[in-house]
Amino acid sequence: MFGIADYGAFVVAVIVFLAIPGPGNLALLGATGQGGIRSGMAATLGVIAGDQTLLWLAVSGISALLATYPAAFQTIQWVGAIYLVWLGAKLLRTRLDDAPALELKPDHFFKQAFFITVLNPKAIVFYMAFFPLFVNPAEHQGLITFAVMAATIAALTLAYGLVIVVSAHMLRSEEH
């Protein structure tokens, strides 16, 4: 289908990839906990934008460049790790009792989730190594193949994010 070797397997692989706990999932939960459904969905859109950025960078050959120059990939990994440590330290330094209630706008959570996704080594590896496995060279249709894959990933991420955000919001509402 559109040059994708096994579309069903591709969909299953993306769903499994989404379900693996990681920084993106935590960003969705954190945004929902801090700002409700709007902020959680903004974070979901940030994850989607980050995924789309990585996907299209992989398509444009950046992934081959990073594979050729492992130091560049390692630098991205370190930048991502430092960013996640900084976010964690910031969270740990804030005591809930003493912290003033911040009115963070949804765009804050969008940006945060975007950078978490773009700097996440798991996502980078997915698009560099795993993603090309589903492209059928004999039936490849150029950008159409990648556009279908990109749209599928975006739709599945949106659906997954919606489930996570609404579930987290409902659980939080039951606690109060």
Where are these regions (language model features)?
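Juxtamembrane transmembrane-helix termini in multi-pass membrane transport proteins
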Residues: 2-74, 129-153, 165-168
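Short alpha-helical functional segments enriched in proximate histidine and acidic residues
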Residues: 52, 56, 117, 158
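Selective transmembrane alpha-helices of multi-pass membrane proteins
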Residues: 68-96, 154-164, 168, 172-175
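Flexible cytoplasmic inter-helical loops of multi-pass small-molecule transporters
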Residues: 93-109
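A short amphipathic helical element positioned immediately N-terminal to and/or at the very start
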Residues: 110-118
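Selected transmembrane alpha-helices and immediately adjacent juxtamembrane segments
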Residues: 121-122
